[in-house]
């Protein structure tokens, strides 16, 4: 897969209350172009927003790309690079035999990541990393904007609990 566009993506999720109003922030960089995306939900969790951010970022890419995706979420990074293989083998159950939380988003992230060559990177949050700080601001602003959009996956997950 050579000759692919090289894209840098930075993502973050935020939740006020956890669960509570939440949002995600994304910074995409291609050559000298930068695009920012953010959205909020009325009731969700921090982990769901940390997962939704890379999903949305990867879904906006129109063609397969070589991606460096940087996040401050160990949950997302370890999940997609390590844990997901066992979950899929076990029918989306954890090593303890429990249903994987946020399975709707894990499945989406798994599917959309198949289109791209991705280098999943972690950066310490709130440590002065320019793009991560910008994503954090975007995510927090989206959560604070009194979003009315429903996170149907979270609502369905709560109904089944």
UniProtKB/Swiss-Prot annotation:
GO terms for biological process: DNA replication, removal of RNA primer. Binds 1 Mg(2+) ion per subunit. May bind a second metal ion at a regulatory site, or after substrate binding. Pfam families: RNase_H. Residues 133-161 are annotated as: Disordered. Mg(2+) 1 binds at residues 12, 50, 72. CDD domains: RNase_HI_prokaryote_like. Its cofactor is Mg(2+). Keywords: Cytoplasm, Endonuclease, Hydrolase, Magnesium, Metal-binding, Nuclease. One of its GO terms (cellular component) is cytoplasm. It is found in: Cytoplasm. It catalyses: Endonucleolytic cleavage to 5'-phosphomonoester. One of its GO terms (molecular function) is magnesium ion binding. It comes from the Bacteria. Mg(2+) 2 binds at residues 12, 136. Residues 3-144 form the RNase H type-1 domain. Residues 150-161 have a biased composition (Polar residues). Its EC number is 3.1.26.4. Its main location: cytoplasm. Belongs to the RNase H family. PANTHER family: RIBONUCLEASE H1 (PTHR10642:SF26). Monomer. Endonuclease that specifically degrades the RNA of RNA-DNA hybrids. This is Ribonuclease H. It comes from Shewanella halifaxensis (strain HAW-EB4).
